[in-house]
């Protein structure tokens, strides 16, 4: 199936960083963009990202494996995993806990002392306010409950509520995550990359996977429409032969309500 190039351009122009695949392309090997994102979210201007990778697959031969959307490392050897979660289910607190454990097992090599375990940050940027408290950030650390003191094990989980898009540094960052136009982005580190991806031939070529996924979705939708059209024809034929609505629904694979609407249209 040939996809209309104009439609593809519309898809590309409508992409924002809240799209996982596009976010990955925006940050892949883009140290400056990853760095500004982490500095703003963690309120730490001293973070200096050394490298950033996307779609890092970490295999566990004895249990559940994980594919990390964005994984960055800074000059202190700390690891930062950033995930965009569009659904509340994807932002499960136990998923965050699991991802934290994945980083621990991956980056403490055999025969090394436990004190050499690097600090890790799991950052979930959520489309919804999953905790429903209206806060822009939910920072999670272990504490000793009896004396309300930090446990200080170097493990951090942060939920970022992307609904909070005010005029603070974090709010402007969240605005950028939803923005589709390079010229309207607040942070130049994102603007330069988006300009490249959306407005250059080379950048467009890097979005092959997104374009192919779009074409696949179009093809699947067309196939569904073809099947539905055939089902409607079967139902109308059965109704014309005097069959009941229930009978027509059963043999056309349409719902009873759909067939009832078809029957009503026939009589008007």
Stretches with model-predicted labels:
Residues 1-18, 73, 80-85, 171-268:
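Short, charged alpha-helical interaction segments and adjacent helix-coil junctions
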Residues 124-127, 161-162, 198:
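Pocket-edge structural micro-motifs
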Residues 144-153, 158-163, 173, 177-180:
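Low-complexity, glycine/alanine/valine/leucine- and proline-rich hydrophobic stretches
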Residues 1-153, 166-168, 221:
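Accessory alpha/beta interaction modules
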